[in-house]
Amino acid sequence: MLDIKYLRNNRDEANQRLIDRNVEDGVLDKLLADDEKRRSLIRKAEQLKAKRNQVSDQIGAAKRAKDNSAAQKAISDMQTVAGQIKDLDKQLSAIEESVHTQAAHLPNLADPRVPVGPDDSYNVEQRKWQPTDLQGRPAAFSKTPTWLKAHFEIGEDLGILDFQRGVKVSGARFLYYVGAGARLERAVYNFMLDEHRREGYTELLTPYMVTNESMYATGQFPKFVDDAYEVGKNQSMTMIPTAEVALVNWRRDEVLDESELPLYITALSPAFRQEAGAAGKDTRGLIRLHQFNKVEMVKFTKPEDSYNELEKMTVDAENILQKLELPYHVIRLSTGDMGFGSAMTYDLEVWFPTQDKYREISSVSNDEDFQARRGHIQYRDSKTGKLRFVHTLNGSGLAVGRTVAAILENYQNEDGTITIPEVLRPYFGEDKISKENAR
């Protein structure tokens, strides 16, 4: 949620920054016009309530003076004022709902350092990394080897990814991990969680269903309600699209102790997504599923520390890819490509040799006080004694299924086996996956 005072006091600047976020020109004008109506109604209501108090005093004085005529007139005036107040309250309730709805659909404003542009073609690469010794792996070849297979083909050949039965049981974009596939997925997320714990994150095991209020606090609702899986009576609960929702809401409606900040938390959870806008995209494989595992990182910080913490969180995500020795690059997203609640986002994209391109595997964002305002998450400043909104940061560390897919593609061998990355071997228990040990 944006600060309405900032929008009022910096109208032109705010309007341009919203246009940069692909908000239509005129949307802010409508919001501020309704906000002024709301404030005008509040002033009128306050004046009428003050008048009601005066009339109440007049009634009391007239009764004490036994002036029945004056008392009856004052009572009549009271009834008139009460009716006016009731009418104003109705108008005020309607305009407040309108203002709140409009404000809830406005995205966060981008940090000035974010590249301005309407789409992903304006994203800017920050850095690129690959292992120094690729040891004959696919990325080492200047030309794609003829034996190279897509991750879903490898998985099906080895019998470790079962898409056909996933579709039979649940429909499109579902699968079973089988044998070594399930063990590899488990090895990957246990490795990720251990790495984040070493970096100071506290691990949580969260609910997988949350209230609509929780989805509102993190910015998923109301704008993206069609992308969510709503469940329960009257659709009062939602399956989480990311552990970010449960992690941020862990401290919703709370005042944190300043000594707790920065607070680092992490969780593994399934993510449930409708993928409403993904028709025809990535119809095969692990890239785009309705249910997938993801390790999420969240931070609560003081405002002055949040961008330094954003850089640290990005490094924490990069650390996973570097230890897995997977080639990747980091891009800074443009104003038109960032998520709804973000003020700045870095995407980490890992190399997929069969696609000859990088694919997103992590998105790391600073939402500044956008979520904290919606979720009423504050801390008391020890110097001023005043309450301040925290800044919240979130990042994938990483999407587990996409990491498995990247490993299958980047560690495949000509004989059809998969070499297990060295850091995963203590978790997986073997150094290769072959047809002999796939189950």
Curated annotation (Swiss-Prot):
The catalysed reaction is: tRNA(Ser) + L-serine + ATP = L-seryl-tRNA(Ser) + AMP + diphosphate + H(+); tRNA(Sec) + L-serine + ATP = L-seryl-tRNA(Sec) + AMP + diphosphate + H(+)
State the pathway, as annotated in the record: Aminoacyl-tRNA biosynthesis; selenocysteinyl-tRNA(Sec) biosynthesis; L-seryl-tRNA(Sec) from L-serine and tRNA(Sec): step 1/1
Q: Does the keyword DNA repair apply?
A: no
Please state where this protein is localized.
Cytoplasm
The record's principal subcellular location, in a coarse class, is: cytoplasm
Instruction: Quote one Gene Ontology molecular function term.
Output: serine-tRNA ligase activity
Spans traversing the lipid bilayer:
none
Q: Where does ATP bind?
A: R273, Q274, E275, E360, I361, S362, S363
Keyword tags? Aminoacyl-tRNA synthetase, ATP-binding, Cytoplasm, Ligase, Nucleotide-binding, Protein biosynthesis
Could you say which residues bind L-serine here? T242, A243, E244, E296, S396
Record EC number: 6.1.1.11
Keyword Mitochondrion part of the UniProt annotation: no
Q: What class of enzyme is it?
A: ligase
Name its GO BP terms in alphabetical order: selenocysteine biosynthetic process; seryl-tRNA aminoacylation
Q: Name one GO cellular component term.
A: cytoplasm
HAMAP family registered for this protein in UniProt = Ser_tRNA_synth_type1
Function of the protein: Catalyzes the attachment of serine to tRNA(Ser). Is also able to aminoacylate tRNA(Sec) with serine, to form the misacylated tRNA L-seryl-tRNA(Sec), which will be further converted into selenocysteinyl-tRNA(Sec).
Q: Which family does it belong to?
A: Belongs to the class-II aminoacyl-tRNA synthetase family. Type-1 seryl-tRNA synthetase subfamily.
Quaternary assembly:
Homodimer. The tRNA molecule binds across the dimer.
About its domains, the entry says: Consists of two distinct domains, a catalytic core and a N-terminal extension that is involved in tRNA binding.
The protein in question is named Serine--tRNA ligase
Native source species: Oenococcus oeni (strain ATCC BAA-331 / PSU-1)
Q: What is the lineage of its organism?
A: Bacteria, Bacillati, Bacillota, Bacilli, Lactobacillales
